[in-house]
Amino acid sequence: MLDARQLEALAAVIEHGSFGAAAKALSITLAAVSLRIKSLESALGQRLLVRGKQVRATPAGQSLLVHVKQVQLMEADLVDGLQSSSLDKFPRMQSLSVAVNADSLTSWFLPGVAGLLARHRLLIDIVVDDQDHTHDALKSGEVAGCVTTLAQAMRGCVAEPLGTMRYRCVAAPALMTQWSEPDAGNKVGGVSAHRLLGTPAVIFNRKDALQDQFLAQHFGLQGALYPRHFVPAVDAFEQALELGMGWGMVPDLLLAARTSRPALVKILPDRPVDVALYWQHWAREPLSAQRLTQAVRQAALAQLLQL
């Protein structure tokens, strides 16, 4: 049998990144945390943590973290069921961790799960990352589910297709006016690749590859070099486009919601970039996580393209 206190210490060290922070979170001494980790590693006969300035889990440590989180959620479900039949008007609230890309979070994920969270008194802890990288948080045990482009289910997980987010290349009208000047070179739909490559792109962060996909898919440009602004916030990203700072990729869902904001013009409106999304989650889901998965399914079905 695994020792519950040792597992709790392991999870705290991984989540907080250091032994000292874990000790503070658990209200025990640093020596006690160290002893529990050493005892657990000795009992299992392998290293569970990679020591360093930022402590991280080994693959075995990641597996144990997933186990700890699943047990914690199942225990919380049990306690919630017991409290619901008692006179306690304010039962303890559970917390679920998920990883979601910023566009999905703003456009359909949060509106789709808000009602569930309120009905079942659930808390949500969201890790925001690019859709091509959110699965890393699930793999590490940090979250119970993620919105991802990874179609292949990871070990111990299920991958469910959600639908497609369709992105358009857009820019401010003033910037498009500048592009109307005659320009030689490779053109698609009247738009010059030379103009695009000579104009800054507005990009969410360094993991964002949508602009590269647009250039490769519609202009045949692989690994193109062009100036870039990095604006890692959805509202500020759109504001940068409105101000004419450059061109960028925005999903149809967010474009449709821009009724009271300055107009953005679609560049090659009939040539989108489609991003297929999946919901990857634990195969063994506690009840609270099952409810979240159902809400995610329903929200995606209502908002995403079902191609």
Language model region names:
Residues A11-T29:
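Short helix-boundary/capping micro-motifs
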Residues A159-M245, A257-P272, A302-L307:
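C-terminal regulatory
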Residues E41-P59:
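A short LG(V/I)-centered, amphipathic sequence patch enriched
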Residues T29, R36, G112:
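Residues within the DNA-recognition helix of helix-turn-helix
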Residues V265-L307:
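A late-sequence structural motif
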Residues H16, A25, E41-R47, R119:
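Residue cluster at the C-terminal edge of the helix-turn-helix DNA-binding motif
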Residues A43-L44, L64-K89, V296:
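Alpha-helical linker/hinge and terminal dimerization helices associated
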Residues P91-R155:
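Central regulatory/effector-binding core of bacterial HTH transcription factors
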